[in-house]
Amino acid sequence: MKVLPLSKIHFIPHVHWDREWLRSTDSSRIKLVYFYDRLIEMLENDPQMKYFTFDGQTAALEDYLAIKPFQKDRISQLVKNRKLFIGPWYVQPDMIIPSGEALLRNLLVGSKYAAGLGHCMNVGWVPDAFGQNKITPYLFKEIGMKGIFAWRGFDYDVLDDSLFMWQGNGDASLPTVHFALGYGHYRGFPEDYEEVKKDMTDFIPKLEARYQDQEVLFMLGSDYAFPRKHSSKTIEQLQKDGYDCIMNNPEDYLDTLLNAAKKNHHQLKIYQGEARSAALGRIHAGITSTRIDIKNAMRHYETMMAKVIEPMISISRFQGGYCDQELINYFWKIIFKNQFHDSIYGSSPDSINHTVENRLLNLRHGLNELIWMNFRYLAESVDLSVLKENEDILVLFNTLPYQRNDYAFTSMIVKDKNFVLKRQDGTIVPYEIMNEVKATSHDIEYYNGMENFHDAGEVLEGTKFKVQIKIAASFLPPMGYEVLKVCFHERTSKRPEGD
């Protein structure tokens, strides 16, 4: 007599797509093009192939459409019809190394892209990050997600079920599904049906122990794993043999789990804070210190974007300057691509790490250009008619939303080492020269070229000293700027005071 499991089996066809890891982005893109071509045909032509989840991210789809833009309408139709599930991430990031601001922007950009194609999957999807951040529930809740699916970092000594409430910082909490055997425990059905039934016998008892409400999750896929053509027919055959099983998607499966828990009066356990245990899956703790040069550079550029460039653009826009959000998103996307989990881990061959470094170089040039562009727009709003022949201007910015009590450091090309800094009301601003050298012609051309929108021909006569000065920044307004006069041939004995 055949004994069937009491649980209902939910098969979720999916793929985890490493944009770059053992292979470069373009090597992976070649596989990606073939993958999506076949996937589109399968989802359109097999009515029983109801759903496919593409890793909770959108960058891979963007990579595909860069090669085949004419496929956009077909993709969009599948997304609208909830056959293909994408988003909310732009890329699958590490959850520990990037800043909270960068993680949130990643979600905002990815969810907007997915929604633009017809639908953003409304659950968080974190299959392969090496540990979980305590702000994760907060981030997903902020963008309207109804739950989370995650794997690494959790521990069954703490959790008694694969469905629980995850509470992050503050009061933010979301129902969370833990991949009990990992996100790729069943890459695909074997073609031999007898082998499939044996797998059911082996796997279901292990999974039933983790799903109290008898709604068992089978992850039908893994890294780069294409759905088997016979998947829908195999599920149909299992149903005929008495198995209670369906093909499902993350959104509907979460609803089913929560309804079952409510029906069974199952009080979900609350898990609080971060998840950094290696009990159920390796978290490779050592990756937090590999290629520290890349990690430090990424922190520098994500901080520059959030705390310097975007505030400057806001100030500039308030003054009538130009702001192109798509340009800002372009550079955020470069940052996100470097925060893709395998990229920021530095776990790839050196050839892949060189690609990461090249993106850092692009960020260096691009973000500096954004800063200078906004300098130019703001400079146009400054009244220069009050300047005398022996005066210049220095504009200092405070891009933070509060008053600063620290120092501002800046380098200038000046006509004379003896000068006084004055506010518009004539108040003298103390400063200290930290370093001074004679400016070369290259320094002078570069300095004036930046100042004059790369018109290096406008070299101010007499500029010959390059000085670095320190100024107490307490007089700068929050999210604002101050225009100082640089008065040459005057002296002051005052020194800056600050923390």
Language-model features: locations:
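Contiguous transmembrane helix-bundle modules in multi-pass membrane proteins
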Residues: 421, 461, 481-483, 488-489
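Charged, glycine/proline-rich intrinsically disordered loops and linkers
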Residues: 434-462
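Catalytic-domain carbohydrate-binding cleft regions of carbohydrate-active enzymes
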Residues: 1-393, 399, 406, 418, ...
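Aromatic sugar-binding surface patches on proteins
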Residues: 463-469
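Beta-strand-rich N-terminal accessory domains
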Residues: 399-403, 485-499
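Short, surface-exposed loop/turn motifs at beta-strand boundaries within globular domains
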Residues: 389, 401-403, 414, 464, ...
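Short acidic, flexible loop segments centered on an aromatic residue
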Residues: 408-415
